[in-house]
Amino acid sequence: MSKVKLTKENIVSLLTQSEDVEFEEDQNQVAFNFKTFCQENLDLIKKMSITSCLTFLKNRQSIMKVVKQSDFTFGKVTIKKNSERVEAKDMTFRRLDSMIRVKLIEETANNENLAIIKAKIASHPLVQAYGLPLDDAKSVRLAIMLGGSIPLIASVDSLEMISVVLAIYQDSQVQELGIEPTKYNTKEALGKVCTVLKSKGFTMDDAQDNKGKEYAKILSSCNPNAKGSIAMDYYSDNLEKFYEMFGVKKEAKIAGVA
């Protein structure tokens, strides 16, 4: 019996006919590996500057809406608006986004580039929302990860522990971070990260455990509630005038809110 391609028509045959049906193995057994995909496609974005990469992350949602309006082509690659089946070699917005984050993380190995990224990414909405302190390369790498597909990035060598620790942090701080469970299931994301690590045979030995603790220490110092305070400080002089008009001192009001 010859094997057939996994198509809509052949699925119908599988469900409605008495003949034996088997699909080609390259379609139902080959799992997607983002690490391999990234290695094969990073050249597509090699011309992107650090600033351009950061611009992409800062405007991710707006860019995604434009890209998904129709088939989007850049260079020789097309992100299809509609696709019944996403193949292992197909480019998707999520894969593109993850590649850009990996590229930026690699750039942090250079001190000059690290300084540029640190200065620019501090103003990104998610970094401010998390109240993430940017003190060193590890904290900057965490900042780059925020908002990205952690399960995809977890497959890249040396990014396993930063991925699993960030996934755990998000799962443990759902309410504090204002994460909407119906839009992003943190428990499911953590499960996917662990599945990726297990499939690549990753071992959490003492060295990896210590590495994870360093990332956990940084995340434990985050203050998700700091965003509002930072914004209030920005308008400090103006706010004080209005507080006084209501007969309330600004400092007392802020202390009450905190």
From Swiss-Prot:
Source superkingdom: Viruses
Matching InterPro entries: Tospo_nucleocap
Subcellular location: Virion
Keywords for this protein: Capsid protein, Helical capsid protein, Ribonucleoprotein, RNA-binding, Viral nucleoprotein, Virion
GO cellular component annotations of the record: helical viral capsid; ribonucleoprotein complex; viral nucleocapsid
Molecular function, one GO term: RNA binding
Family: Belongs to the tospovirus nucleocapsid protein family.
This protein's domain notes: The N-terminus and C-terminus are involved in homooligomerization and play an essential role in viral RNA synthesis.
Protein's job: Encapsidates the genome protecting it from nucleases. The encapsidated genomic RNA is termed the nucleocapsid (NC) and serves as template for transcription and replication. The NC have a helical organization.
Assembly and binders: Homotrimer. Binds the viral genomic RNA.
Protein name per the record: Nucleoprotein
